[in-house]
């Protein structure tokens, strides 16, 4: 269908909360595979892929069929009930990866928020089971975090504390306390900020994506 780009942008500016800068004069209408098309018929190679989430590309027929069938069957039940698709997908993910369990969420920032909670819960239980002498030595469960310079972990309050760029963090301070930044790809730098009994979790990206693509050394 025909899309009026100017009207779309006027409506965006008038009714959508402006939290993200969008490309001016570009209204994307549809895609196929690695290609996107705008309202004027221009064709683009989609190098962003929804910021690294559209792994099957746009308009994948099999994926569209599965989504449509599920939408016609059962849409959402919350976590209060068992459902077969969730159980089957978790089983497949675990059997084909390193993980022992699967956790489903909506975004990377939500995954990182959950990771902080998982780590804190783990160290809380670990501390609770310690001998009294060990509890007196450590004083409290480990809660601190470590992430790396130039890393990006999300824009919610916990994940934002792990994110390097000050321009992202400054307007929302004070953030979650207790995070230290190490130099990416430098184990000695990481060793200086990882503290026994205090550091609960270390966040590291196999390849950083802020300002380019920077893979870590294998070691």
Where are these regions (language model features)?
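Active-site core of PLP-dependent enzymes with the aminotransferase class I/II
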Residues: 192, 207-219
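Acidic active-site catalytic centers that drive phospho-/nucleotidyl reactions
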Residues: 38, 46, 70, 110-113, ...
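Active-site-adjacent loop/helix segments that line or gate small-molecule/cofactor pockets in enzymes
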Residues: 1-31, 80
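PLP-dependent aspartate aminotransferase-fold enzymes
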Residues: 91-201, 210
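Glycine-rich phosphate-binding segment of PLP-dependent enzymes
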Residues: 42-44, 50-80, 84, 88-106
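Active-site and channel-lining beta-strand-loop segments
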Residues: 25-46
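Generic structural signal for well-ordered, non-membrane alpha-helical segments
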Residues: 5, 29, 60, 82-86, ...
């Amino acid at each position: 269908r025909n899309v009026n780009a100017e009207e779309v942008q006027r409506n965006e500016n008038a009714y959508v909360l402006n939290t993200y800068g969008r490309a001016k004069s570009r209204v994307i209408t549809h895609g196929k595979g690695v290609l996107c098309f705008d309202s004027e018929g221009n064709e683009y190679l989609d190098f962003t892929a929804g910021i690294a989430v559209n792994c099957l590309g746009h308009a994948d027929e099999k994926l569209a069929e599965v989504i449509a069938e599920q939408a016609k069957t059962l849409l959402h039940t919350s976590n209060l009930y068992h459902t077969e698709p969730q159980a089957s997908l978790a089983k497949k993910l675990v059997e084909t990866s390193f993980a022992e369990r699967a956790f489903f969420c909506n975004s990377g920032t939500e995954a990182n928020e959950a990771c902080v909670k998982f780590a804190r819960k783990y160290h809380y239980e670990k501390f609770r089971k310690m001998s009294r002498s060990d509890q007196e030595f450590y004083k409290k469960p480990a809660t601190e975090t470590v992430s790396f310079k130039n890393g990006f972990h999300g824009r919610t309050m916990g994940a934002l504390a792990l994110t390097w760029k000050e321009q992202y963090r400054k307007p929302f301070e004070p953030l979650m306390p207790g995070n230290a930044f190490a130099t990416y790809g430098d184990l000695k730098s990481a060793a200086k900020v990882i503290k026994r009994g205090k550091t609960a979790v270390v966040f590291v990206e196999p390849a950083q994506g802020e300002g380019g693509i920077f893979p870590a050394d294998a070691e």
